[in-house]
C-alpha cells in the first residue's frame, strides 16, 4: 500500500504519552484525514461492513414491534375472553427468531470485516514504523528515550487498532440504532416520544460532567502508573546494586509512595466514572415512569395499543445505550487522534541523508585500508530542538594501510565518536573522510560498513544460539568457519563444555553469560567477518588479565596487514600500536608511538602514569 501523505503534528512526548485517556491532539482534522488515507484501500470492505451494520440494527430494532404484536394478540384474547390464537403467536415467535438470527449474522459479518481492516492497518503502521526506525539517523535516538519509541510502536498503534475495530463499529451501530428507534417511537406515538426525549438533555449533562471530573484523575492514574512501572523496571535491572548497597528500604519507600498515589488516583477516577451508570439509569427510570403514566392514559383512551406500549418501553430501555456509547466514542476518538499524531510524527521525522551519486564498491580484497580524516567537524545534538555543539573540531589525520592506530584520551574526548563517523552513523558538520582516497559518502552505507569488522564496548548479543550470534559477522559462514572464529577468540573451549555446544540458546539480555564471555563472542564475530579495517572499542575491557593476554596475541594475528583503530582506556593494551592519537576536547593534542609520547612528557604521560599510581 502506498504511504499516504504524512502530516507532522507535534504531539506530546514521553513513554506513557500514548496511554493517557483524554489526551487531546493538536490537529484533530489533519490527523483523522491522514488516518483516513490508510482506510481508503479498504473502501469496499468498509461499505459492506456499513451495510451489514445497518441491516443488523434494522432487523433488531424491528423485533420489538413484532413482539408488541404478540402482546396485542394475548391482550385481545384476555379482554374478549376468546381462545388464544396460537397459530399467530407461533408465526410471530418464528419471525422473531429469524429477525434476531439474521441480525446476529450481519453483526458477525460487520465484526469480521472491521477486525480484518483494523489488523491490516495496524500491521501496515507497525511495518512502516519498523522500516522508519531503520532509516532514522542515530542522533534521533540520542534525544529520545526507549520508552517513548516503544510507546509509539506498541501503545499508540494498539490504541488505533482498538478504535478501528470497536469504536468505528460502535459509531455505525449506535447512529443507526438511534435513528431507527427514534423513527419507530415517532411512528408508535409522537407525544410519547416527546415525553421520552425530555430526559435526554439531562442524560447528556450528566455524562459530560462525569467525564470532565474523572478525566484529570485518569491522567494522574496513568502518570503514577508510569512512575510505578519505571521504578519496578529500574529496580529489576539494577537489583544487584540495590542488594549490594542495602537499598531495599529506600526502594520500598519510593515504591510505596508511588503506589499509594496510584491507588488514590485510581480510586477517585473509578468512583467518579462509576457514578455515570447509576445516574443515567436513574434518569432513564424517571423517563420510564413518565412513559408508563402517559402510555397508560393513552391506552385507557384507546389511542395506543398495549403491545405498542410494550414495544415503546423496550425502545426507551434501549435508547440510552447507543447515546452513552456515542458519548464515550467521542473521548476515545480524541485519544486515538492523539495516538495517531504521535505515530505520524515519527513517520514524518527526517531520515538519514540519502545516498547519492554512488560509486561501485570495490571488492573487500582490493581495499587497502587507507583512511583520511580531512578537517572533520562534528557535534551531537544537545536535545530535540537545540543546535549541535561541536565536539570534534578540525580533526585531520592519515591512517596508512595496515597501521595500528590507538586512540586514547579522557572520557568525552571524542574517541568513540571518531569511529562512529567512520561508519557513517552520523553525518559530518564539516570536512570529509576518505577510504583509499574516495569520500565515504560516495559509497552506500551498507557497502561501506561491510569493510569494517568491529568489537564495540557494548557487547550486544541477541536471543538465539551461540552459532547464530557468531554468524552475525558473516551470514553465509559455514559451521567450520564459525568454529575457527571461536577458537581464535578463545571461546571455543567454553562453548564445547556446554550441553548443547554451539546450539546453546542465549537468553534475553545474554543473562546466562558472563561479561567476559559476551565480549569473547563479539570478538569471534570480528574474526569471522575478516574485514580489511578493524575497529576495537575497549575490546578487552570485560575479560580477565590472563584471557586478555591470549586475546592480544590473537588480535595481533587478526590485525596483521589490516588497518586497525584501537580505542582503549587501559594504556597498557596499546603499547605496540604504530601510532597513538591522544585526544582531548575533540582535538588531537599529541601523536606518536608509545615511547615517543612518554619522552614528550606531555598529556599522554600524565594519563599513563595516573593508571599506575
Language-model segments: residues:
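ABC-type nucleotide-binding domain
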Residues: 362-613
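An intracellular "coupling" helix at the cytosolic face of ABC transporter transmembrane type-1 domains
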Residues: 138-139, 157-164, 168, 172, ...
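Hydrophobic alpha-helical segments in the permease module
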Residues: 95-103, 107, 200-207, 273-287, ...
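Transmembrane helices of ABC transporter permease
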Residues: 45-58, 99, 166-220, 291-304, ...
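Cytosolic ends of transmembrane helices, especially the final helix of ABC transmembrane type-1 domains
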Residues: 115, 224, 247, 271, ...
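Helix-loop junctions and hydrophobic alpha-helical segments within the transmembrane domains
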Residues: 71, 129, 133, 242, ...
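Transmembrane helix-loop-helix hairpins at lipid-water interfaces of multipass membrane proteins
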Residues: 3, 46-106, 187-191, 302-306
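Juxtamembrane loop-to-helix connectors within ABC transporter transmembrane domains
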Residues: 21-23, 30-31, 39, 71, ...
Amino acid at each position: 500500500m502506498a504511504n499516504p501523505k504524512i502530516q507532522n503534528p507535534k504531539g506530546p512526548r514521553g513513554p506513557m504519552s500514548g496511554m493517557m485517556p483524554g489526551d487531546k491532539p493538536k490537529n484533530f482534522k489533519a490527523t483523522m484525514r491522514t488516518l483516513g488515507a490508510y482506510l481508503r484501500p479498504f473502501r469496499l470492505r468498509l461499505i459492506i461492513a456499513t451495510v451489514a451494520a445497518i441491516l443488523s440494527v434494522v432487523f433488531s430494532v424491528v423485533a420489538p414491534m413484532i413482539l408488541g404484536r404478540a402482546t396485542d394478540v394475548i391482550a385481545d384474547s384476555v379482554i374478549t375472553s376468546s381462545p388464544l390464537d396460537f397459530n399467530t403467536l407461533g408465526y410471530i415467535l418464528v419471525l422473531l427468531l429469524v429477525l434476531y438470527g439474521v441480525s446476529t449474522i450481519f453483526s458477525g459479518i460487520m465484526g469480521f470485516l472491521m477486525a480484518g481492516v483494523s489488523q491490516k492497518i495496524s500491521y501496515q503502521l507497525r511495518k512502516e514504523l519498523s522500516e522508519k526506525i531503520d532509516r532514522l539517523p542515530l542522533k534521533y535516538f540520542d534525544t529520545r528515550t526507549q520508552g517513548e519509541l516503544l510507546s509509539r510502536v506498541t501503545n499508540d498503534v494498539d490504541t488505533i487498532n482498538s478504535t478501528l475495530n470497536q469504536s468505528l463499529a460502535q459509531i455505525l451501530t449506535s447512529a443507526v440504532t438511534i435513528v431507527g428507534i427514534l423513527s419507530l417511537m415517532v411512528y408508535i406515538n409522537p407525544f410519547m416520544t416527546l415525553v421520552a426525549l425530555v430526559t435526554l438533555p439531562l442524560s447528556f449533562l450528566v455524562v459530560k460532567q462525569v467525564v470532565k471530573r474523572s478525566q484529570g484523575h485518569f491522567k494522574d492514574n496513568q502518570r503514577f502508573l508510569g512512575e510505578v512501572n519505571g521504578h519496578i523496571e529500574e529496580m529489576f535491572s539494577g537489583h544487584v546494586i540495590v542488594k549490594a548497597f542495602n537499598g531495599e528500604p529506600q526502594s520500598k519507600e519510593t515504591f510505596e509512595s508511588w503506589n499509594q498515589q496510584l491507588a488514590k488516583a485510581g480510586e477517585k477516577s473509578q468512583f467518579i466514572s462509576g457514578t455515570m451508570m447509576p445516574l443515567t439509569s436513574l434518569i432513564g427510570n424517571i423517563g420510564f415512569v413518565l412513559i408508563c403514566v402517559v402510555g397508560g392514559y393513552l391506552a385507557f383512551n384507546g389511542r395506543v395499543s398495549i403491545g405498542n406500549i410494550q414495544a415503546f418501553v423496550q425502545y426507551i430501555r434501549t435508547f440510552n445505550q447507543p447515546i452513552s456509547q456515542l458519548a464515550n466514542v467521542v473521548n476515545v476518538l480524541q485519544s486515538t487522534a492523539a495516538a495517531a499524531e504521535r505515530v505520524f510524527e515519527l513517520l514524518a521525522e527526517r531520515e538519514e541523508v540519502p545516498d547519492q551519486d554512488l560509486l561501485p564498491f570495490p571488492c573487500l580484497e582490493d581495499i587497502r585500508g587507507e583512511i583520511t580524516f580531512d578537517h572533520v567537524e562534528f557535534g551531537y545534538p544537545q536535545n530535540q530542538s537545540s543546535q549541535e555543539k561541536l565536539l570534534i573540531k578540525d580533526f585531520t589525520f592519515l591512517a596508512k594501510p595496515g597501521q595500528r592506530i590507538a586512540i586514547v584520551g579522557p572520557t568525552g574526548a571524542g574517541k568513540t565518536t571518531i569511529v562512529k563517523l567512520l561508519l557513517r552513523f552520523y553525518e559530518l558538520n564539516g570536512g570529509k573522510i576518505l577510504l583509499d582516497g574516495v569520500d565515504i559518502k560516495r559509497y552506500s552505507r551498507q557497502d561501506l560498513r561491510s569493510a569494517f569488522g568491529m568489537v564495540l564496548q557494548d557487547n550486544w548479543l541477541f536471543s538465539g544460539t551461540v552459532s547464530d550470534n557468531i554468524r552475525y559477522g558473516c551470514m553465509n559462514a559455514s559451521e567450520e568457519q564459525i568454529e575457527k572464529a571461536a577458537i581464535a577468540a578463545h571461546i571455543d573451549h567454553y562453548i564445547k563444555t556446554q550441553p548443547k555446544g554451539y546450539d546453546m540458546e542465549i537468553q534475553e539480555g545474554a543473562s546466562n553469560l558472563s561479561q567476559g564471555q559476551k565480549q569473547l563472542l563479539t570478538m569471534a564475530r570480528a574474526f569471522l567477518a575478516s574485514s580489511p579495517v578493524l575497529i576495537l572499542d575497549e575490546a578487552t575491557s570485560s575479560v580477565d588479565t590472563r584471557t586478555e593476554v591470549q586475546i592480544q596475541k590473537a588480535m595481533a594475528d587478526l590485525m596483521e596487514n589490516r588497518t586497525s583503530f584501537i580505542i582503549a582506556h587501559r594504556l597498557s593494551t596499546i603499547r605496540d600500536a604504530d601510532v597513538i592519537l591522544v585526544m582531548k576536547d575533540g582535538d588531537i593534542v599529541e601523536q606518536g608511538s608509545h615511547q615517543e609520547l612518554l619522552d614528550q612528557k606531555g598529556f599522554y604521560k600524565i594519563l599513563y602514569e595516573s593508571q599506575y599510581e
